[in-house]
Every structure is written in C-alpha cells, then in structure tokens.
A protein has these predicted regions:
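C-terminal His-loop and adjacent cap/lid subdomain of alpha/beta-hydrolase
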Residues: 1-197
C-alpha cells in the first residue's frame, strides 16, 4: 500500500482549533518528498526505504518465530473479521514453519477499563486476564520449550444480571488441549479459516 499523508493537521489538545488548519495543497509537499525518495530506484536512500518497507510488509510470514495473537470476539473497535482472523489465515498460507497460536475470547472487547461501568460489567469479561496467561505461556515456551497452545476459542461466560464477582466458570483458562469443537483451524485446500461459533 501507499503511505498515509496527513491532509488536515488537527492533533491539538481537545481537537482541531479551526478548519483553517487544513493544508490547501492536500499535503503535496510531504507526498512529493516521499515519492522522490522512492522513485530513483538505485539511490542509497531509495534502496534503504524499499528495504524498510519490505521488512514490515504484511505477509503473515513470521519466519517460524513463535507468536500468540489474542483477540476479544466482541471487539467493536478492531473487529476480529478484519484483523486477527485474516492474519491467522495469511500466516498459515505463507509461513510453512508457523508457530502462531490464535486465541479468540468471546465476551471480551477492547476496553477493559470500561468493565466497571453498567452494561459493560454484566456483558463482558476482562481480556487482560487472558493477556497475562498468554504472556506466561510464551515465557514458558521461550524458557523451557513448553508447547504453545493450539489455536482456539476460549468459552467465557459474562457475569450477567447484578454483575456478581467473576469466578473460574466465567473465565476458564486457555486450554493446552482444547476440545475439537473449540479448535480454530486453517484448511489449506480451500484457504479457509474455520472458527467455531
């Protein structure tokens, strides 16, 4: 993809001060500068820029590096269908030595800080709880070669009416051997990520 160019500079504290902060030339100077860096393909600056772009280009190939992607299924800000699920599929297509575990957590969303508020406290569970588990799992993998968990859906239960205290029944652990009905898989023949409901 092409680089993003700011057209309106509105990062003032409290929001944009006035509509006049828009750049009348649609940030042409910045775009032109990037284009001039990229265009002369054989200059040192252009080669360095292209190398940098290639190093971060999204291919999904982690080159066999272990990784855990953890995502709340109820995340409305960063939806799983447009981020983690396709990345998991891209990784499985392009990384023959894949060590990626994808953990999807129903009833978890983007903002754990909101969990004390009415409506959030009865409908969602804390994703941070699973972040801690994922970090421990990765630590154990890196330190003692413990197996990473298979990709899976972790079956959580929201607290419900009155928001009673969380229990282990609400937030079961990431399973080292998930049930077949909870396992996330990739079908290479059809290039399809299969996510249990």
């Amino acid at each position: 993809g092409s680089p993003t160019i700011a057209v309106i500079y509105n990062n003032a504290q409290g929001g944009p001060v006035t509509h006049t902060v828009a750049n009348g030339d649609f940030a042409f100077a910045g775009a032109d500068c990037l284009r001039q860096l990229w265009s002369p393909a054989q200059t040192a600056a252009a080669l360095a820029l292209r190398q940098g772009v290639n190093e971060v280009k999204l291919t999904g190939n982690l080159r066999g590096k272990p990784a855990i992607v953890l995502h709340g299924r109820s995340d409305a800000l960063v939806p799983v269908n447009h981020t983690s699920r396709p990345y998991f599929g891209l990784n499985k297509l392009n990384d023959p030595a894949s060590k990626l575990s994808y953990i999807e957590v129903p009833n978890a969303q983007h903002f754990d800080a909101f969990l004390s508020l009415g409506g959030y406290n009865t409908s969602f569970i804390p994703l941070h709880y699973y972040t801690q588990q994922a970090l421990e799992l990765m630590w154990n993998h890196l330190r003692s070669n413990a197996a990473l968990p298979p990709s899976q859906v972790v079956r959580t239960t929201p607290r419900g009416s009155g928001a009673p205290d969380l229990t282990a029944a609400n937030v079961p652990p990431i399973a080292s051997t998930p049930a077949a009905a909870d396992t996330i898989t990739f079908d290479a023949a059809t290039r399809t990520v299969k996510i249990p409901d």
